Amino acid sequence: LLTDGMVVVGVEYRLSPHVKTMEIVDDAAAAVAWVFDNIGKYGGDTSSIYIAGHSAGGYLVDMVGLDKKLLARYGKDADKLAGIIPFSGQVITHFETRNQRGLKPLQPTIDETAPLYHVRNDCAPILILSGDREKELYGRYEESAYFYRLFKLLGHPDVTLYELGGF
């Protein structure tokens, strides 16, 4: 990718059960803020920052890109992202959060820790990727489709849902 003029930053974050879900989300926000502050040193451009992640990473990029308070803590504006690319990210309250609260694994919940709670029509362009609806983790495609539909209903100008074959 570097030969194509792209800089890729892979980040680490603390894991459950050692920390709560929102601490993990804050780790992701801190990492994105670091990218804004430092990408120029590596040949990157702050106007071309895309955030992407798979599964838990998909959840994290949704939260960081949609809940403006997360990056604002670090003096950054989530609307300055060039794009958000979640792949198979959970958009209801994360199962780990539900587990921490003693809820049943399949009990759907939507609160301030859920990307669905923060859907808005003025965020960065968003490309929602999902695996095959018949093979994807339980309910994940349906969550992604609902997420997409809410963006459309709110009038987001640049949202795409793409279902990958297989998986």
Question: What name fits each language-model region?
Answer:
Residues L1-G10:
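Short amphipathic alpha-helix adjacent to the substrate-entry channel of hydrolases
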Residues L2-T3, D37, N121, L153:
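Residues at the C-terminal ends
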Residues V9-V11, F87, Y162:
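The conserved SAM/SAH-binding core of class I Rossmann-like methyltransferase domains
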Residues Y13-P17, V91:
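Alpha/beta-hydrolase active-site loop signature
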Residues S16-H18, L164-F167:
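Histidine-bearing beta->alpha loop at or near hydrolase active sites
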Residues A30-Q100, I110-D111:
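Primarily recognizes the serine-hydrolase "nucleophile elbow" in alpha/beta-hydrolase
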Residues G75-T97, L106-A145, R149, L153:
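The feature captures the conserved acid-bearing segment of alpha/beta-hydrolase catalytic domains
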Residues Y148-G166:
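Catalytic histidine neighborhood in serine/cysteine hydrolases
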